[in-house]
Amino acid sequence: MDTASIYLGLKPPRTLGAWHESPPSLPPDACRCPRSHRLALKLSCAGLILLVLTLIGMSVLVRVLVQKPSREKCCVFIQENLNKTTDCSVNLECPQDWLLHRDKCFHVSQVSNTWEEGQADCGRKGATLLLIQDQEELRFLLDSIKEKYNSFWIGLRFTLPDMNWKWINGTTFNSDVLKITGVTENGSCASILGDKVTPESCASDNRWICQKELNHETPSNDS
């Protein structure tokens, strides 16, 4: 076979472009979504934004409602304390015929009776028999009374079966503050005579001294 026949039998190879043909072009409106789909997407986005705003508004409202009672309680507490402060500055007085000393009011009876009757009389006045706090308080009372020859019942008595002196509020007598001079017997109650505290029969007749804590109410004229 000659050379010319060989060349004629061979087919020419395809060009490179034939293996990489471009894909067929799409119609111009192939990527466009239908108008109804676009509208639905917009409505969904708007609904989502509205939902987020609603949740934020509700959370703010809940927080305000939770904090409101606390603020109201705080205002009430402040107002009550302001009222108390006002009362303290205005009504620091004892009833008529009572003596004021520090935070107590004192009343000296003008009649004599037993220790029990003296305590009952103080109770009717919203008070108790005298509970001596210290020597300074006792000196104030002695200087105010200025009666050296009269005995006055105080809220101290000898109790059984403890066999000990106790104040009527239940506290034990402290001999470092006061000294009791005299013989103590069963059924003894304490009275002050001058600057001395002495034991006496609770059935004896003496005058007495009442005391009550200073309060911030309008003073009464009861004596």
From Swiss-Prot:
The entry's localization annotation reads: Membrane
Extract the Pfam families matched here: Lectin_C (PF00059)
The gene for this chain is Klrb1c
Membrane topology per the entry is: Single-pass type II membrane protein
Q: Which UniProt keywords apply?
A: Disulfide bond, Glycoprotein, Lectin, Membrane, Signal-anchor, Transmembrane, Transmembrane helix
Q: What is the effect of changing C31S?
A: Absence of Ca(2+) mobilization and no LCK association
What is the annotated tissue distribution of the protein whose record heads this document?
Expressed in natural killer cells.
> Cytoplasmic compartment: which residues?
1-45
Motif LCK-binding motif location, chain numbering: 31-34
| GO CC annotation terms, alphabetical | cell surface; external side of plasma membrane; plasma membrane
Residue ranges in the Extracellular topological domain are 67-223
Glycosylation site list: N83, N169, N186
Function of the molecule:
Plays a stimulatory role on natural killer (NK) cells cytotoxicity. Activation by cross-linking of the receptor induces Ca(2+) mobilization and interferon-gamma production.
- The name on file for this protein is Killer cell lectin-like receptor subfamily B member 1C
Q: Which domain of life is it from?
A: Eukaryota
Q: What sequence ranges are listed for the domain C-type lectin?
A: 101-211
- Relate the assembly described in the record: Homodimer; disulfide-linked. Interacts with tyrosine kinase LCK.
Q: Where does this chain mainly localize? A: membrane
Q: Name one GO biological process term.
A: natural killer cell activation
GO MF term set: carbohydrate binding; identical protein binding; signaling receptor activity
Further remark: The anti-NK1.1 monoclonal antibody (PK136), recognizing Klrb1b and Klrb1c genes, is known to identify NK cells from B6 and SLJ mice, but not from BALB/c ones.
Q: Name the cystine pairs.
A: C94-C105, C122-C210, C189-C202
Report TM segments.
Answer: 46-66
